[in-house]
Amino acid sequence: MLMNDKIRIRLKAYDHKLLDQSAADIVDTARRTGAKVVGPIPLPTRINKYCVLRSPHVDKKSREQFEVRTHKRLLDILEPTQQTVDALMKLDLSPGVDVEIKV
C-alpha cells in the first residue's frame, strides 16, 4: 500500500527513560512487521527555566530557579506495509509520551 512513502514519528516527553522505552516499543513493532526503521534519533532537549522570588514580600536578590526539560526523539519508518500501520495503531504507549505522526 505505502511502498514509496515513509512514516515520520516524533516523540516528546519529560522523562527520558519513558521516552526511550516507547521508542524501543515502536522500533520493535515496526521491525516485526517487516519495515525498515531509522532511529531513534535524539533531537535537542528543550530546557525551559523559570525564575521565581523565594520570599513573598521582600528580598529581590534571593531567587530560585526551576527548569522543565523536554526530551525528543525522531523515528523514520521506511517502506511501511499495511500490517505495520495496523500494528502501530494498536500499539499502546505510556501516558507521558506525546506522539506526532506524519505520513
UniProtKB/Swiss-Prot annotation:
<dbReference type="GO" id="GO:1990904">
    <property type="term" value="C:ribonucleoprotein complex"/>
</dbReference>
<dbReference type="InterPro" id="IPR018268">
    <property type="entry name" value="Ribosomal_uS10_CS"/>
</dbReference>
<dbReference type="GO" id="GO:0005840">
    <property type="term" value="C:ribosome"/>
</dbReference>
<dbReference type="InterPro" id="IPR036838">
    <property type="entry name" value="Ribosomal_uS10_dom_sf"/>
</dbReference>
<comment type="function">
    <text>Involved in the binding of tRNA to the ribosomes.</text>
</comment>
<comment type="similarity">
    <text>Belongs to the universal ribosomal protein uS10 family.</text>
</comment>
<dbReference type="GO" id="GO:0000049">
    <property type="term" value="F:tRNA binding"/>
</dbReference>
<dbReference type="InterPro" id="IPR027486">
    <property type="entry name" value="Ribosomal_uS10_dom"/>
</dbReference>
<protein>
    <recommendedName>
        <fullName>Small ribosomal subunit protein uS10</fullName>
    </recommendedName>
</protein>
<dbReference type="InterPro" id="IPR001848">
    <property type="entry name" value="Ribosomal_uS10"/>
</dbReference>
<dbReference type="Pfam" id="PF00338">
    <property type="entry name" value="Ribosomal_S10"/>
</dbReference>
<keyword id="KW-0689">Ribosomal protein</keyword>
<dbReference type="GO" id="GO:0006412">
    <property type="term" value="P:translation"/>
</dbReference>
<keyword id="KW-0687">Ribonucleoprotein</keyword>
<comment type="subunit">
    <text>Part of the 30S ribosomal subunit.</text>
</comment>
<dbReference type="GO" id="GO:0003735">
    <property type="term" value="F:structural constituent of ribosome"/>
</dbReference>
